[in-house]
Amino acid sequence: VVLVPAVIYTALGMLRLAPAWRAPTKLTQCGCGDGGFTMWYLGWMQYALGHGHNPLFTDWLFYPTGVNVMWNVSLPLPGFLLSPLTAEWGVIFSYNVLVVVAFAGTATSAYLVLRRWAPWPPAAFAGGLLYGFSPYMIGQGLGHAHMLLLLLIPVMLLLLDELLVRQQIRFWITGPLLAVVAVAQLLTAEELLASAALIGGIGAGVLIVLFPGRVRTRLPHALAGLALAGVIALALAAVPLKNQLTGPQRLTGTVSSPDLYRADLLSWVVPSRLVHFAPPAALDISSRLGGNVAENGSYLGIPLLVIAVGVVVLLWRSRPVVRWAGFTLLAVMVLASGRSLKVGGHETGVPLPFRVVEHLPLLESLVSIRLASYAVLLCALLLAVGMDGLRGWIRTWQAEPAPAEGTGTRRAWRPTAGVSAGALAGALAVVALLPLLPTSYRYNGIRDADIPPWFTSVAVQARVPDGSVLVTLPPASPQTSAPMVWQSAAHYRFKVPFGYSLHPGDDGRGQFGPYPSTFGGVMARVRRGPQPRLNAESIREMRANLAAWQVRTVVLRDQAHTH
C-alpha cells in the first residue's frame, strides 16, 4: 500500500535536486552558507565515530576553544545513519541523499499517519503531497536540512492521538514509543522537538475545551503514558543533554530573536518565489513581507484555506477530528505571526500570544514563522479527511435502493459511483494543491561545490601534519562556509581557528563567527574589498594571532605555504 506513494514522493524529491544527479559527489546546493555548515557536521559525525573522538564536541572548528555540537543544528542522528555513505562517497553525496530523504520521508510519513483519519489512499496521498512539498518545505530545502526533516512530526501526532484519544494500546507501550521518537527528534533537530511540544500542548488544550467529558475519562491513561515517556526520554537523552547543559562551550541566553522571521497576515495568501504560479504583482507584495526566501514559506493559498474551512463546517458533527484540527490550525497561525501582528509588511502594534510563549523554558529562541509547518500538517489532515468524506458522501448519494429480499434491504451501487466520487475528490485536491506547485528545481541553485583539488590530493598528507592547525584564505565564516567543505574533503586532517557555527562569545551569548582578531578583521576586509593597507603593527599582530592558534599551514586556494 505504501510502496507506490513512497516511490512517487522519492521521485519528486529527486526532482528537486535534478541537476545534481549528473555528478552527486560534486554538484549540490552551493556548498556554502547553511548547506556547507550541514555538510561539515554530516562529515564530522562519521569522522568522530570512526576515529574515537567525542562526536558532541569538536575543536576542529574555532581552534583551540572549539564548539559544543549540541548547541548547533548538527544532525547527530542523520549524520550517524548516513555515515556509511559519507565514508564511501563524501559529504556532498550524503547531503544530497539527506535532502531527498527529507522530502520523500516527510511526505510518506504523513501519508501513513493520515490514513488513520482518511482511510482512502488517494486522500492520504494528497495530504502527504501537501505536507512533503509545501512552500515551507521548498523554502527550507534551500539550505536548512534540519528544518526539512519533518518525518517524525506526524509520528508524534499519531502517538499522541493514541495516548490521549483512542487509547487502544496499553500506555506502557505507547509511552516508550513516544519517548524514542522524541529522542530521535532531539538528535535530529532540537528546535522541532521544542515546537512539537508547544503545539502538542496547544492541541491538548483544544481537546480539553472541545471534549471535556471524554478527556476526563481518558486522563489517567494519558498522564501515565506521558509520565513514562518523559522518564524514558530523559534517560535516553541524558548524555547529549548533559553535554549541552554542562559541557564545554555551552551558551547562555537566547540564540536568536524569535521575531526575526515571522508570518505576515498576507503571507498566508500571497504567493512568493517558492511557488510556480506567482504573478509579478504578488511577488512585489511578497518581497515586502519580511524575512528571506527560505523563511517565507507560510503561504497556504486561498483555495486551500477555503477548503479547510469548508471541511470543518460540513464535517463538524460527523468527524470530530476536524473540529480539533480547525481550532488548532487557527492557534498555530496566530503563533506563527510572532509577537505582534504585521500586515503587508507594516507593524500594527497589536500584541499576539507569542509574547507569552517566547518566555517559556526552551522556547526563547524559537523562530515563530517555522511554526507554519504545523499549519501545513493540519491543512493536510483537513484536506485528506475532506476528500475521504466527499468520496463517501457521493458514493452514498449515488446509491439507489434495490428490491427488498426477505426481511432485509440491500443497496446496489451504480457502476459509475466509485469513479465519479473519486474524480470529484481528486478535483478537490487539484484545486487545493495546484496554487502550491513548487517553483522549478532550477531555482535551487545547483552547482559544483568547487573544492580545490589540493584538498583531495596526496599533497595534504605530505604537507599537513595530521591534527595540526591550518588556515585557509579565505577562512570559513558565516558569509562563506565553503572552506569547511574543503576541510571535510580532506577527511578532517587539520583543525581551523575559524568557522561557521554557534559558540559562546566573550559574554557567553551565542555567536556564529570567529572571536575578534586582527587577522580575522583583515581577512573580512579583504573579502568585502577594497584591499586594506597594512602597517607593521598590523602585520605583527596577525603573526601573533597565527602563533597563538598554533597554525602550521596557510593555504591560498590551490597553493600551500608551510611555516
Give the residues covered by each predicted segment.
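Membrane-interface coil-to-helix junctions
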Residues: 12-106, 135-151, 262, 266-288, ...
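Membrane-interface helix-loop-helix junctions at transmembrane boundaries of multi-pass membrane enzymes
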Residues: 211-226, 308-351, 412-415
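Extracytoplasmic
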Residues: 254-256, 430-563
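Periplasmic/ER-lumenal interhelical loops and adjacent helix-loop junctions
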Residues: 29-48, 235-312, 361-372
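Signature aromatic-anchored transmembrane alpha helix within multi-pass, membrane-resident enzymes
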Residues: 205, 226-231, 381-437
